[in-house]
């Protein structure tokens, strides 16, 4: 599943390449891709005849502003890529591939195509008269952004002080911190030198400070590399993310730790495959 760095990479691409994209026509090939009330018919009526304006990211959600030709607000287009969703910009209309779910066409004949192999990705139209969390309920439950002032060791200490679950489980919970998934939870815990099985409430203040610093560091490095591609992720221009080759532990089970030489372990923690070094992470 695309995590914060991959979604941020897509956000940057959407903002860079679509600043003059006026949606003239929409085709919805898979009804379940549209999650807002009224289904695809209402979605098409609401979103077409709009400019795609600026793009923001909240956790793993993409939020695009919709504007009239006079640059008045028409609300927002909200997208969650889920497991395998990706956007592709085509300079001219070509035959839809098997996993194409939604197609947006502009006045110049360009196509913004949403492709989703697993078909879990979703889109919402949020009218300007409503708040985004009213329509997209998942956004209500998100914790602070890792790069925000609200995310710090004091916040984590207070939030986790009664949590008996593992710190790996806590990091994957979007209510703890928004946008972190399996890849960057593993990489962060390695960088911070923390055992992923350790109970959240038992982490010391010094460990929580390291955890915050490591998360921001790892995410920034991955964003700079365009995210991680292990299977389906591509940016808007079809380019793979490059962070995977730099991974310290993720998908390196059985290989030697790059720091100490110990074998990297892989085991299930909170139902997720977890990669870690038993020597470096205490």
UniProtKB/Swiss-Prot annotation:
CDD domains per UniProt: EcFpg-like_N
Start and end residues, zinc fingers (FPG-type): 248-282
Sequence positions that bind DNA: 99, 118, 163
Cofactor notes: Binds 1 zinc ion per subunit.
> What are the UniProt keywords, alphabetically?
DNA damage, DNA repair, DNA-binding, Glycosidase, Hydrolase, Lyase, Metal-binding, Multifunctional enzyme, Zinc, Zinc-finger
So what does this thing catalyse?
A: Hydrolysis of DNA containing ring-opened 7-methylguanine residues, releasing 2,6-diamino-4-hydroxy-5-(N-methyl)formamidopyrimidine; 2'-deoxyribonucleotide-(2'-deoxyribose 5'-phosphate)-2'-deoxyribonucleotide-DNA = a 3'-end 2'-deoxyribonucleotide-(2,3-dehydro-2,3-deoxyribose 5'-phosphate)-DNA + a 5'-end 5'-phospho-2'-deoxyribonucleoside-DNA + H(+)
Superkingdom to which the source organism belongs:
Bacteria
Q: Name one GO molecular function term.
A: 8-oxo-7,8-dihydroguanine DNA N-glycosylase activity
One annotated GO biological process: base-excision repair
Reported EC number(s) for this entry are 3.2.2.23, 4.2.99.18
Q: Where is the active site?
A: 2 (schiff-base intermediate with dna), 3 (proton donor), 60 (proton donor), 272 (proton donor)
Q: Which cofactor does it need?
A: Zn(2+)
Protein task: Involved in base excision repair of DNA damaged by oxidation or by mutagenic agents. Acts as a DNA glycosylase that recognizes and removes damaged bases. Has a preference for oxidized purines, such as 7,8-dihydro-8-oxoguanine (8-oxoG). Has AP (apurinic/apyrimidinic) lyase activity and introduces nicks in the DNA strand. Cleaves the DNA backbone by beta-delta elimination to generate a single-strand break at the site of the removed base with both 3'- and 5'-phosphates.
Assembly and interaction partners: Monomer.
NCBIfam families from the UniProt entry: fpg, PRK01103.1, PRK13945.1
Give the family from UniProt. Answer: Belongs to the FPG family.
List the protein's name.
Formamidopyrimidine-DNA glycosylase
Q: Which organism is it from?
A: Prochlorococcus marinus (strain NATL2A)
């Amino acid at each position: 599943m695309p995590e914060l760095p991959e979604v941020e990479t897509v956000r940057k691409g959407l903002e860079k390449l679509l600043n003059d994209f006026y949606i003239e026509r929409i085709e919805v090939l898979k009804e379940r891709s549209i999650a807002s009330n009224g289904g695809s018919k209402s979605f098409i009526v609401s979103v077409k005849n709009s400019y795609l304006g600026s793009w923001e990211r909240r956790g793993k959600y993409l939020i695009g502003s919709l504007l009239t030709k006079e640059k008045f607000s028409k609300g927002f287009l909200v997208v969650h890529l889920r497991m395998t969703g990706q956007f592709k910009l085509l300079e001219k209309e070509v035959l839809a591939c098997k996993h194409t779910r939604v197609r947006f066409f502009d006045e110049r004949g360009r196509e913004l195509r949403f492709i989703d192999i697993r078909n879990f990705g979703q889109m919402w139209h949020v009218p300007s008269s409503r708040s985004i969390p009213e329509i997209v309920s998942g956004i209500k439950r998100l914790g602070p952004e890792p790069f925000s002032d609200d995310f710090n060791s004091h916040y984590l200490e207070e939030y986790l002080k009664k949590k008996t679950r593992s710190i790996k489980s806590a990091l994957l919970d979007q209510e703890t911190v928004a946008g972190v998934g399996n890849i960057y939870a593993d990489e962060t815990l390695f960088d911070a030198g923390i055992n992923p099985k350790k109970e959240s409430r038992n982490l010391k203040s010094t460990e929580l400070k390291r955890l915050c610093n490591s998360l921001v560091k790892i995410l920034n490095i991955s964003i700079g590399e365009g995210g991680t591609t292990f299977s389906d992720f591509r940016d808007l221009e079809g380019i793979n993310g490059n962070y995977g080759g730099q991974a310290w532990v993720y998908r390196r089970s059985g290989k030697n730790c790059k720091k100490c030489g110990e074998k990297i372990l892989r085991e299930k923690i909170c139902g997720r495959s977890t990669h870690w070094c038993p020597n470096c992470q205490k």
